[in-house]
Amino acid sequence: MALKQISSNRCFGGLQKVFEHSSVELKCKMRFAVYLPPQAESGKCPALYWLSGLTCTEQNFISKSGYQQAASEHGLVVIAPDTSPRGCNIKGEDDSWDFGTGAGFYVNATEDPWKANYRMYSYVTEELPQLINANFPVDPQRMSIFGHSMGGHGALICALKNPGKYRSVSAFAPICNPVLCSWGKKAFSGYLGPDESKWKAYDATCLVKAYSGSQIDILIDQGKDDEFLSNGQLLPDNFIAACTEKKIPVVFRLQEGYDHSYYFIATFIADHIRHHAKYLNA
């Protein structure tokens, strides 16, 4: 599978690159970012996947979070895909910011006209890791995942649906219980249809309640002044309650004065990289 390099920039001794490829799952051209730390020049490194939030491309995280310093320090290859298929010419794909383009929600759609292209779940859990493992100096056995908002939801469900696949998981302001919030209801009804029982397969709170896999340590940071926390889109309390009931270890940090933005992410990104490095470099 041919990769086309779009850009390459030296950063903290490593290289921040962006590539384009033709996705089999999504049936369109996709871009992803990959950071190769200095350690990747001499051997295989663990892989850490970042999933971005609504409206984002592969660019937001790599240009705003400043994660490269910590990734360089801990020797992690960090991969950041786009948030949806692009340019599929599906009627309505560009009509709203929270559905369609830039809003794939990391599910495999089952409804027309989305089901042929909107397969972000399989893309981030199967196709992209296979592509990364084949083309970059990563250790396929050492992989973790994290994300923000819609991407925090994506990271949590990918980890919970695949016990043992990821060494660790973390999230910034994740959409924790999408079956109960308006963003989730809109996306899931569009991509997965009206049967709400099918939605639960992509809801972190529902997945935790049924989880029986190997222990996974979860780190979540949430800004206390996040407008989407106060208006009921994120619902972290439901997720924490489910984790507590199932005795799944979760560190939940409510950060005073912080909002939903990349300023919040940039403040705590090094903590998250450290969290993953602890498991990936063990």
Swiss-Prot record:
Its main location: cytoplasm. The modification N6-acetyllysine is found at K200. Its EC number is 3.1.2.12. One of its GO terms (cellular component) is cytoplasmic vesicle. It comes from the Eukaryota. The keyword Acetylation applies. NCBIfam families: fghA_ester_D. PANTHER family: S-FORMYLGLUTATHIONE HYDROLASE. This is S-formylglutathione hydrolase. The gene is Esd.
